[in-house]
């Protein structure tokens, strides 16, 4: 029996085709719980477009917004497992994993954009380390506008919140509500209108942005612009997926992330001003808390800060020291 052999021409052609065939482009999925109307989602989609453009299509990132692919609570575990390559979450929802994740929801610690940025720079090394232990890598973080209190009455005294069901999206906010005498209720952003209409929620602590996107004027009349804190969304990737990229593509991702962070902070500032105007134009009274209410909110926040320091230990001490040092250097 004759053994079949390949001709030299066939071998040469096969080798030529193998050499000429380009490497397959990488495709990532990025899961986000936020809808397309959110400036966060718009920024995330621009980040994805920037990556595609910078890599000439060698890496494409599909953003699945509004929880369309994965629910908020499952995004981080899914990225960790590699089910999806990237995700966006509300950072403080991880506070049950480490007190460090609560730092940007401590009332009175950072109530302005300048302070919030210093706090992010001070906390970023520790948060990056915590993510790395799970095979994850933060890309960038963007804050929501400062948090305030929505009610269907003029809020002049914290005693008015006693017994009310107050929407609180994370553990620290829930503790804050309890310190004020309210009953914390956890409700996803998309469910806010239904929660108010069914009586599951009487008031809520959130930003002017969320109030605008959720048409808060349909169920509340007042917004107390208390500048309690500026919580952040964090965008992160599966480290193995990132490591599989070549050096040029990795650099393109990091460069696009740096631009997204800078752009996102500016978008947040702009959205804060625009959202406040929208609320007022729709009949919501936007006002700063009076002196008595400010003191009551500060007292409730101080309790949280002291409790947080005791739970977070040395890491909290180091983080706050770095934060205060940055503030001192910049004369804040």
Task: Identify the residue ranges that each predicted region occupies.
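N-terminal secretory/targeting leader peptides
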Residues: 26-117, 123-332
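Bacterial N-terminal signal peptides that target proteins for export
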Residues: 1-9
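Hydrophobic helical h-region of N-terminal Sec-dependent signal peptides
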Residues: 10-17
